[in-house]
């Protein structure tokens, strides 16, 4: 899946380089399309086709109420921010402070294509692959093992150290939600909300504030012109802080239940059987190489 998608991305990258060399302007939406198209239109279909050949476990679906859904959602916030801090610090440390998050270039693009990919397409396809396809096939070896493996593969899939840790943490919550409900709509909706908050609302609020104008601004006109933006941004930031604190409390107090299975792997054999096989090793090595390339770029 990854190799086919990256191969197509390289071809599109050569096309992009050729256009730039010939002084042809490339809009942000086209760059976004070149990045997303190979993975979601080529890599994922191949991945789904391969996974179909692996027997899966079908379990009864269980519903959750709105209150529990909201509680699980806000548990993602402290995990997301803590993971983001770890990923950013580690990226800066390993690159000598030179690394930049490639995703930032696209998040401030206001094209409808970005919203479609980030908020709709990515959550649906990623949850279908990393939650349903993987967990349905691995949960018989232990629910904890399946969730951890799913989250690890999900984190590596981003091939971006800035995103790796918070993707892993959020993947644990989404994996738990899917494992307990076996209903994909809950994890998809959570994923959509998280991506909407980080990929649409946050860039929109930041772009509504003219930071350059406010730097050292002493005149009242400059302050007044940004006042509404600051009020909205501050209210949103305060709400996130409150919800993040609530998420920490819920994480500490909520009991997470895991059911045992007949074929559950013994503790001493889990890592060897799950992560030390040829497929997992090749996938991990490939993603790590791409992460290193991204840091060095």
Question: Where is each model-derived feature located?
Answer:
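Small-residue packing motifs within transmembrane alpha-helices
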Residues: 1-3, 9, 32, 39-43, ...
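Membrane-helix interface motif
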Residues: 10-22, 85-96, 197-214
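Membrane-helix interface linkers and caps
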Residues: 16-74, 92, 102, 244-265
């Amino acid at each position: 899946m990854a190799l086919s998608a990256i191969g197509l991305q390289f071809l599109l990258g050569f096309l992009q380089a050729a256009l730039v060399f010939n002084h042809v302007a490339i809009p942000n939406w086209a760059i976004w399309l070149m990045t997303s198209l190979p993975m979601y239109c080529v890599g994922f279909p191949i991945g789904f086709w391969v996974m179909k050949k692996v027997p899966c476990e079908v379990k009864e679906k269980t519903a959750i109420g709105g209150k529990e859904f909201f509680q699980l959602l806000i548990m993602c916030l402290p995990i997301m921010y803590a993971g983001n801090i770890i990923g950013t610090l580690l990226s800066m440390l390993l690159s000598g402070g030179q690394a930049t998050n490639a995703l930032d270039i696209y998040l401030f693009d206001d094209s409808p294509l970005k919203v479609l990919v980030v908020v709709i397409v990515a959550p649906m396809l990623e949850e279908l692959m990393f939650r349903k396809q993987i967990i349905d096939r691995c949960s018989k070896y232990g629910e904890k093992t399946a969730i951890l493996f799913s989250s690890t593969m999900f984190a590596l899939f981003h091939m971006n150290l800035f995103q790796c840790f918070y993707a892993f943490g959020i993947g644990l919550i989404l994996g738990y939600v899917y494992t307990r409900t076996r209903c994909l709509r809950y994890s998809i909706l959570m994923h959509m909300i998280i991506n909407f908050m980080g990929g649409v609302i946050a860039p929109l609020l930041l772009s509504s504030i003219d930071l350059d104008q406010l730097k050292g601004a002493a005149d009242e006109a400059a302050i007044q012109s940004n006042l509404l933006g600051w009020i909205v941004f501050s209210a949103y930031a305060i709400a996130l802080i409150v919800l993040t604190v609530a998420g920490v409390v819920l994480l500490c107090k909520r009991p997470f239940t895991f059911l045992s299975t007949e074929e559950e792997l013994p503790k001493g054999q889990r890592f060897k059987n799950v992560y030390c096989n040829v497929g997992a090793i090749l996938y991990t090595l490939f993603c790590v190489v791409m992460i290193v390339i991204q840091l060095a770029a």
